[in-house]
Each structure stands twice: as structure tokens, then as C-alpha cells.
């Protein structure tokens, strides 16, 4: 998790996101600059060379809510994927209860009168809120891997 401070999420750009429901895995691909804390920050000779293509790989996703602005698909512009921030912390019992996790059941209300309950086991979970100019991800998961997709510095 400490790798999150290696990147400046206020300046990055969302490239794509893919959710595999069977594997319960979410991959968010972003182009984001490295910070001074990154071990390779000294390799860059200008700001553009600080950017890296990064995959945020959320494993064992238990909850995913993605809010997408109509502008993302109907009138996208060059700023649509601008990243604004990311927070990541242990998911508190209060948050889990608010999201429908409680008493070993996950309660889902589909809004049309349909209610579903699924069994779950109490486990240590993490929560992330990741926001761009046109979309917000709320994710409850067990493990996060942060992987740069190229060995050398990416030039824009």
C-alpha cells in the first residue's frame, strides 16, 4: 500500500478500467507522474519523463460502485480522465454496515422492491475512493497491487 505515495494522483489521467466479476478483480490503468518518494524519480530529466503507466490491481473485490458522468461517454473532452485524488484505508465496521455488510449477510436493494442477501465472512477489508474529473470509484477489497507496466520511463 505504501506505493500509493510514489505517484501524484492529482495530475494523472485515467486510461481505462476493467472489472472481472468472476475473478473479483478490478484493474484501473492510469498515466500518472512519479513523486520524489519513487525510487526512480531521479531518472527523469523533465516533468513529462516522470509519468509512468500504472495498473492499480484490486483483488478480491467485495464491493464496487462506479459513478460515471454523462460527459464521459456523450461529450468526452481531453480532461475527462483527469485524476483528482485517491484515498485508501482499512474499511471500518461503520462503513461496511453502511454499504450493506452486516450480520454475515450483504444486503442489496435493487430499488425496484427486490432485495437480496448474500452470505459473507468477516475479514479485514480495505476501502478506496478514486476520483477523476468524470467518474468516481468506491471499492471494498482485500488486496491492492500497484504495477508499472513498462521498464523504462514513458515519454508523452
Label every model-predicted segment.
Residues 1-156:
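Surface-exposed, interaction-prone regions used to assemble/regulate multi-protein complexes
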Amino acid at each position: 500500500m505504501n506505493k500509493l505515495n510514489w505517484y501524484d494522483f492529482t495530475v494523472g489521467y485515467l486510461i481505462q478500467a476493467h472489472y472481472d466479476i468472476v475473478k473479483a478483480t478490478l484493474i484501473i490503468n492510469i498515466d500518472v507522474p512519479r513523486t520524489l518518494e519513487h525510487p526512480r524519480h531521479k531518472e527523469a530529466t523533465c516533468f513529462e519523463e516522470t509519468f509512468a503507466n500504472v495498473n492499480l490491481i484490486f483483488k478480491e473485490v467485495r464491493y464496487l460502485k462506479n459513478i460515471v458522468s454523462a460527459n464521459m461517454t456523450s461529450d468526452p473532452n481531453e480532461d475527462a480522465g483527469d485524476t483528482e485524488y485517491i484515498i485508501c484505508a482499512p474499511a471500518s465496521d461503520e462503513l461496511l454496515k453502511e454499504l450493506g455488510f452486516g450480520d454475515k449477510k450483504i444486503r442489496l436493494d435493487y430499488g425496484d422492491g427486490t432485495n437480496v442477501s448474500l452470505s459473507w465472512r468477516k475479514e479485514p477489508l480495505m476501502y478506496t475512493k478514486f476520483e477523476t474529473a468524470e467518474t468516481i470509484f468506491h471499492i471494498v477489497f482485500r488486496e491492492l497491487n500497484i504495477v508499472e507496466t513498462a521498464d523504462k520511463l514513458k515519454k508523452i
